[in-house]
A protein has these predicted regions:
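Juxta-kinase regulatory segment immediately upstream of eukaryotic protein kinase catalytic domains
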Residues: 1-26
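Conserved ATP-binding subdomain of kinase catalytic cores across diverse folds
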Residues: 24-151
């Protein structure tokens, strides 16, 4: 997919957070599957606007149902634990405020989630310590999902 125009991105984002007045869109490069933009609002709030590639994920509806189910489970579970904002941060999706034909077609499905400040994406660990930290976080994530009910 070619980059999307600013006016198209603004219209898509408005389906999720109406009248937010996005200040800017920055395409995040490096991914090979989805098309991803960082959205900065004039208020300072930041979001990710992403087009999921339906050619790679043919059951996007099922994918998003699982994502919402896991997010809700983590939110509930973490709310009963000691408040430590750095303990585990995860994607918190923004459901569409209104449906639009432009949110999905046979190739792309658009979604929005809150930007997680201070997080970096890597394709490989830069050191054994970084690999250990990533593995430890993934293990914690898995343990938090151990009691996730079946759909």
């Amino acid at each position: 997919m070619n980059p999307v125009s600013t006016s198209e991105l603004a219209a898509l984002f408005d389906c999720f957070i109406p009248n937010a007045g996005p200040a800017s869109f920055e395409q995040l490069k490096g991914g090979h599957i989805n098309l991803t933009y960082k959205v900065r609002l004039a208020s300072g709030a930041q979001y990710i606007l992403q087009a999921v590639n339906a050619n790679v994920f043919p059951n996007v509806t099922g994918l998003m149902e699982n994502v919402f189910r896991i997010s809700a489970h983590l939110e509930k579970k973490l709310s009963t634990m000691d408040p430590d904002p750095n303990a585990l941060r995860f994607l918190r999706f923004v459901p569409p405020a209104r449906q639009s034909a432009s949110l999905s077609d046979d190739k792309w499905y658009w979604r929005v989630y809150h930007f997680i400040d201070g997080v970096v994406t890597r394709t490989e660990a830069k050191s054994p310590a970084e690999a250990y930290t990533a593995a430890k976080a993934f293990g914690r994530f898995q343990s938090l999902l151990a009691d996730l009910p079946e759909p």
